[in-house]
């Protein structure tokens, strides 16, 4: 059964936070299901989010909701398991829209993920994400 794989024991990291204001724009807002909060990166050539799961998971879908004008035209999902080096799972190409976008992911068992957001629509390279959902199943 497909479910959200991000849990309280999932360790998340981000490339940057706008003005280092984690309280208002921090990574916790990626997963809080609140329409009023977001992760807002600082400027830079590319931005990323990494996730370390407490156990192996099988990812089937990724859902991302950007703020229009602060999205990524090209994104890359990488994963690994058991301390191995990250390897590319898939490239995906989000639209510059406020809508929640769903991307099917080739099924792969991982305990670590990294999403890299490249070619941002913002001139300064900032990314704003209201929702990030990693869907799939816990590996058994």
Swiss-Prot record:
Membership in a protein family: Belongs to the NR2C2AP family.
Name of the featured protein: Nuclear receptor 2C2-associated protein
Highest taxon in the source lineage: Eukaryota
Assembly information from the UniProt record: Interacts with NR2C2/TR4.
Source lineage: Eukaryota, Metazoa, Chordata, Craniata, Vertebrata
Statement: the UniProt record of this protein carries the keyword Nucleus: yes
Entry keyword set: Nucleus
Annotated GO CC locations: nucleoplasm
């Amino acid at each position: 059964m497909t479910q959200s794989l991000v849990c309280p024991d999932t360790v998340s990291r981000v490339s940057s936070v706008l003005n280092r204001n984690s309280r208002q724009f921090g990574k916790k807002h990626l997963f809080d299901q609140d329409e009023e909060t977001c992760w807002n990166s600082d400027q830079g050539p590319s931005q990323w989010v990494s996730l370390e799961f407490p156990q192996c998971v099988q990812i089937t879908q990724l859902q991302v909701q950007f703020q229009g004008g602060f999205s990524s035209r090209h994104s890359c999902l990488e994963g690994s398991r058991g301390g191995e080096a990250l390897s590319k799972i898939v490239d995906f190409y989000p639209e510059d829209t406020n809508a929640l976008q769903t991307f099917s992911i080739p099924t792969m068992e991982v305990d670590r993920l990294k999403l890299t957001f490249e070619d941002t629509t913002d001139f300064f390279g900032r990314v704003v994400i209201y929702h990030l959902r990693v869907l799939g199943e816990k590996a058994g």
